[in-house]
Design a protein with these regions (language model features):
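C-terminal His-loop and adjacent cap/lid subdomain of alpha/beta-hydrolase
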Residues: 2-409
Length: 409
């Protein structure tokens, strides 16, 4: 792996005029991004923040439920979101929000400033009001639309602000970008268990269970579904698992899970390859071969996962057609491998273009995005596909998109 480089200097030891302009432009973008996040956060906090759960939920209203035994990555409070529906069906949704796999990534949580400037930013480390818009009232979590086939379901959104795929159990000391000693609380597993206690208290006997997740939450689905069904909902027999975008190959996942996240042995011991998602899925199905319906979704040239892939391989937080092509080829292989361990798994493959053309690639996740309702070439939306699958009608969508020999986007 290459080492990270600093911006080049001119022969005189100072930045060139062009570099100075670039630095100033980045600073302006950073300030603008921070300002936009603050404005949106204040708006949510003052006018649109989900009410605190008071013990008497109104149907189809999202509530925040703080959990006293849980903690976000920066040590601040942790809450989940709950919604009561009109049925006995329950969706447990694992939120995404990046990953920290070493000291460098731990020191660079997501901020509006970093995103706007294109600076490395790897994971959300708290649940500030701004994060609400990523968690509820979009895609599968919409409540005010008849087009959502899950609108009548009960929901528990297990939020995520720990950078550990929901399985960490340790505290990690790192040096921040400004030189301060900080602690990243990898408490994802404890947050998960506290969330499940609340879920069982509110929704004790679901007739149907959908365990779903996007991005980092998609990795948690195979890691934690066995615990959910063994310990918390052992009597539910109608269970569907769905992961949206869980592909990031890295040769040191076992070391990260064991030594950085301090995850329990049950999570790091099955990790033998560079594909943590595949290893966790193989472990889950080897011990519970006929327990679940299994679903997976991805876009073909995911701009964000390819950025992370490039960072893992080359220590460059960027994406381009070459790394997107590599991501595509890895996706082709992963789909083959998933089908080999779960012949009945159904796939939803799409190629919706990323909304920032300069970066290229395809979008990252769809289940909690407007793309959830967008029709594919086969005239079916993810919403329809997922609803059918939860009722036992499994089908593949978009598999022809994986038949290219040379990938480009």
């Amino acid at each position: 792996m290459t080492s990270r480089s600093t911006p080049p200097l001119s022969s005189s030891g100072s930045s060139s005029p062009k570099e100075v302009l670039g630095i100033r432009a980045q600073e302006l973008l950073s300030k603008a991004g921070g300002a936009v996040e603050n404005i949106i956060g204040r708006h949510i906090e003052t006018t649109a923040e989900a009410p605190l759960f008071d013990g008497a939920p109104v149907a189809k209203v999202w509530y925040r439920l703080p959990l006293s035994g849980a903690m976000s990555g920066d040590g601040s409070e942790y809450h989940i979101y709950i919604k009561k529906g009109f049925t006995s069906r329950l969706c447990l949704f694992f939120s995404g929000g990046g990953v920290a796999w070493n000291a460098f990534t731990a020191a660079r949580p997501v901020t509006g400033s970093a995103v706007a400037a294109g600076a490395p930013n790897y994971y959300w480390n708290n649940l500030r009001p701004f994060t609400q818009f990523m968690n509820i009232n979009i895609g599968i979590t919409e409540t005010d639309t008849a087009r959502n086939p899950f609108v009548d379901w009960n929901f528990v959104v297990i939020t995520y602000a720990t950078g550990d795929f929901h399985v960490g159990r340790g505290d990690f000391l790192y040096t921040s970008e400004d030189g301060r000693q900080e602690i990243l609380h990898f408490h994802g597993y404890e947050n998960f268990r506290e969330s499940m206690k609340a879920a069982v208290s509110l929704f004790p006997n679901p007739s149907k269970l959908l365990i779903a997740g996007d991005s980092a939450g998609a990795f948690a689905v195979p890691a934690l579904s066995g615990i959910i069904t063994d310990e918390f909902y052992p009597d539910c027999r109608d269970i569907t698992l769905f992961s949206d975008s869980a592909q990031l190959l890295y040769k040191d996942w076992r070391q990260t899970a064991r030594d950085i996240w301090k995850a329990d042995k049950q999570f790091w011991e099955p990790l033998h390859t560079d594909n943590i998602f595949l290893d966790w899925y193989g472990e889950l199905l080897s011990t519970r071969p006929d327990r679940f319906r299994c679903l997976y979704a991805s876009t073909t040239h995911d701009y964000l996962l390819s950025t992370f892939l490039n960072d893992v391989m080359n220590k460059s937080y960027s994406t381009d057609s070459a790394v997107q092509g590599l991501f595509y080829r890895q996706l082709q292989e992963m789909v083959r491998q998933l089908r080999s361990i779960c012949p009945g798994m159904a796939f939803f493959i799409s190629d919706w273009k990323h909304l920032v053309p300069s970066q290229g690639g395809t979008v990252h996740t769809a289940v909690r995005q407007p793309f959830f309702y967008l029709k594919t070439r086969e005239n079916i939306s993810m919403a329809e596909w997922l609803s059918d699958a939860a009722c036992g009608k499994l089908q593949d969508v978009g598999m022809e998109l994986l038949e290219q020999k040379e990938a480009g986007c």
